[in-house]
Amino acid sequence: MAEFGRNKKSNGKKFTKEYKVKAIQQNITRKARLKKEYLKALKEEGYAVPEKETSRREVNVKKLKEDKRLEGKKKIDEKKELKKQRKREQREKLEERRRKEEEKVKIIRQKEQEREQKRRKMTKRTRSGQPLMAPKIEDLLSKIKNDDTYTL
C-alpha cells in the first residue's frame, strides 16, 4: 500500500514528546543565535546596543516565586509545629496517666502494708497461746478518737 505522502524517515515521530522537545530546543537556540548576530551587527555598524534590562515582569515573577516559596515553607513549619505540639501533648497525657497509675499502685501497696501490720498486731499471742488484749484495745481507742460522733 502507498504511504500517502508520509516520509518513511519520520515514521510518525513528529507527534512524540521527544521530537517536540527537540524542536523547541532547536527553535530557542536558533532565536538566540539570530539575536546574537543582530546585536553584533549593530555594534559593528556603530549603533547603540540596547542593554539587557530586567523587566518588571521578571522581577515580579521572581518576587512571586520567592513569596510562594516562603509561604510554602511557613505552612510546612506551621504543620511541623502543630505535629510537635500534638506529640508533646500526647506525651504529657501519657506521663500524667502513668504517674496517676503509679500513685494508685503506691497507695494500694501502702494500704496493704498497713492492713498486714494491723493484722499481725491483732493476732499476737502470749506464750501460753492467749490473745493479747492491748493491741485490740488500742485499735478500739483509735477508732473512737477518729470517729466524729464522739468528739465535741
UniProtKB/Swiss-Prot annotation:
Pfam families documented for this protein: rRNA_processing
Coiled coil, from the record: 71-122
Segments of this protein annotated with the region Disordered: 66-152
Composition skew (Basic residues), residue ranges: 118-127
UniProt biased composition (Basic and acidic residues): 66-81, 89-117, 136-152
Keyword Lipid metabolism among record annotations: no
GO BP of this protein: maturation of SSU-rRNA from tricistronic rRNA transcript (SSU-rRNA, 5.8S rRNA, LSU-rRNA)
Transmembrane regions listed in the UniProt entry: none
This protein's record includes keyword rRNA processing: yes
Family in the record: Belongs to the FYV7 family.
Protein name listed in UniProt: rRNA-processing protein FYV7
